[in-house]
Regions:
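Short acidic (Asp/Glu) patches
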Residues: 117-121, 134-136, 142
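Short glycine/proline- and aromatic-enriched beta-strand/turn motifs that initiate or cap beta-hairpins
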Residues: 22-70, 210, 284-291, 295-298
């Protein structure tokens, strides 16, 4: 019996503790359907642009399977493994920002290279992310009475990116170029269809660069309430430490003068503007969340 216990623990990769109420000691298995909501501003970020601000919401919806491998006098140890889908929505705001780059010869009508300048104002960008997460944790629990118990969680959570899209953009971009063949005179003419002012609403979007894999340590405390003989409800607070680099580092500073444009999406008339997500050096999910679950024990 002990060998089976150790094999199951190794298989689950468990490093967690979860205290659960139980209706009777014969219940060895549990199915837990849960929803988890991020608390506060769920994404914090570092950026090369000091005026860039962000706010976000996160959530998680999943199903866990638990196996009680030890119980005695109201105490229980339980191994858990599950799967969940975790969507996130991040809104980025920027009042104004300027940058420039050396455009290649192919960008010009007569095959000459030139310097292009951008002035961005009132830029708003919304990014939608999705991840599949695999929580693996242990359970220690104390049954206070027939309908109420306390629990504490300790484990790990693995995350895998499923999608990342720029779902909304608004703001304005004004661009112009300096051409060496015209003795560095400022050129701003309507026939250059990628110059002038462009409204960025309904632009054609690129894909934000996001880390495809993440890992965090899962810690939680909460209470379980009995609803019927086998059905219970659980409310807990969880702390997921270690989910970092949701966005990868792209550049080492604010100097974007180079041979190719630092571009992620463009609008229909050819005006190009860099995605705000590329200016994030790093970001991370807020570690604190509220979890509500329905539990069926058998």
């Amino acid at each position: 019996m002990k060998a089976i216990k150790y094999i199951v623990l190794i298989l689950f990769g468990v490093i967690s503790i979860n205290v659960c109420a139980q209706n009777n000691n014969s219940e060895r298995f549990a199915i837990k359907a849960s929803a988890e909501i991020g608390l506060g501003n769920s994404i914090s970020s570092n950026s090369y642009i000091s005026s860039l601000s962000s706010k976000a919401t996160t959530g998680s919806y999943g199903l866990d399977f638990g196996w009680t491998f030890w119980s005695q006098k109201g105490h229980r140890l339980e191994a858990n493994i599950g799967v969940a889908y975790s969507p996130a929505a991040i809104e980025l705001e920027l009042g104004s920002f300027d940058y420039n780059y050396g455009a290649p010869a192919t960008a010009d009508m007569d095959g000459e290279s030139y310097q292009r300048y951008y002035e961005i104002s009132n830029l708003h960008q919304k990014v939608s992310l999705g991840r599949v997460t695999l929580p693996i944790y242990l359970t220690y629990g104390y049954k206070c009475n027939g309908w109420f118990g306390l629990h504490a969680d300790l484990g790990v959570r693995f995350g895998f990116k499923t999608n990342a899209t720029i779902s909304e953009v608004s703001g304005e971009a004004y661009s112009y170029g300096i051409y060496p063949q015209y003795d560095n005179l400022l050129i701003d003419e309507s026939y250059l269809n990628d110059f002038g002012t462009t409204n960025l609403a309904n632009a054609g979007y690129g894909t934000p660069v996001c880390n495809g894999f993440s890992t965090s340590v899962l810690v939680g405390v909460g209470a379980e309430f009995s609803i019927s003989k086998h059905l219970g409800a659980d409310i807990s607070v969880r702390y997921n430490r270690g989910i970092t680099n949701l966005f990868k580092e792209q550049y080492s500073g604010q100097d974007f003068t180079n041979a190719s444009a630092p571009i992620n999406y463009s609008v229909s008339d050819g005006q190009q503007v860099k995605s705000l997500t590329d200016y994030l050096s790093s970001s991370k999910v807020s570690p604190l969340s509220l979890r509500i679950a329905l539990i069926y024990r058998f």
